[in-house]
Swiss-Prot record:
Family: Belongs to the GcvH family.
GO BP term (any one): glycine decarboxylation via glycine cleavage system
Cysteine disulfide links: none
Transmembrane segments: none
Cofactor: (R)-lipoate
Subunit record text: The glycine cleavage system is composed of four proteins: P, T, L and H.
Coiled coil: none
InterPro entries reported in the protein's UniProt record: 2-oxoA_DH_lipoyl-BS, Biotin_lipoyl, GCV_H, GCV_H/Fam206, GCV_H_sub, Single_hybrid_motif
Record has ATP-binding as a keyword: no
The protein's name in its UniProt record: Glycine cleavage system H protein
GO cellular component, one term: glycine cleavage complex
């Protein structure tokens, strides 16, 4: 993990690590624990434009299918293709190698509405 990048969290249990106007997005450890073992991840297409709240990814576990929402406006620059063959990486490394997508931020001021790690920990307590 790059310590220079700032990490933000949403009330929907997503994390964003922002560096140079690009956000890497995934689900939190709390979210993956609630979902259980993931068996499929439907990844977004590169170039897709998202508005905050849009469904970006669908994750399926042995328990349920869940939408993962765009935490901010932006454009998909990369999807984590490794998850197509190994969705369990989200379970084993949710905040690292199990990231879901990267996006170019359309409006960095939207980050102000997200939580820092301390606020997120209080949210799930």
């Amino acid at each position: 993990m790059n310590l220079m990048a700032k990490t933000y969290f949403t009330s929907d249990h997503e994390w964003l690590r922002v560096e140079g106007g690009i956000a890497t997005v995934g689900i939190t450890d709390y979210a993956q624990e609630q979902l259980g073992d993931l068996v499929f991840v439907e990844l977004p297409e590169t170039g897709k434009k998202l508005t905050k709240g849009d469904t970006a990814v669908v994750v399926e576990s042995v328990k349920a299918a869940s939408d993962v929402y765009a935490p901010v406006d932006g454009e998909i620059t990369e999807a984590n293709g490794t998850l197509s063959s190994d969705p369990s990486l989200v379970n084993s490394a949710a905040t690292g190698a199990g990231w879901l997508w990267k996006m170019r931020l359309a409006d960095e001021s939207q980050l102000a509405g997200l939580m820092d790690e301390a606020a997120y920990k209080a949210h799930i307590a």
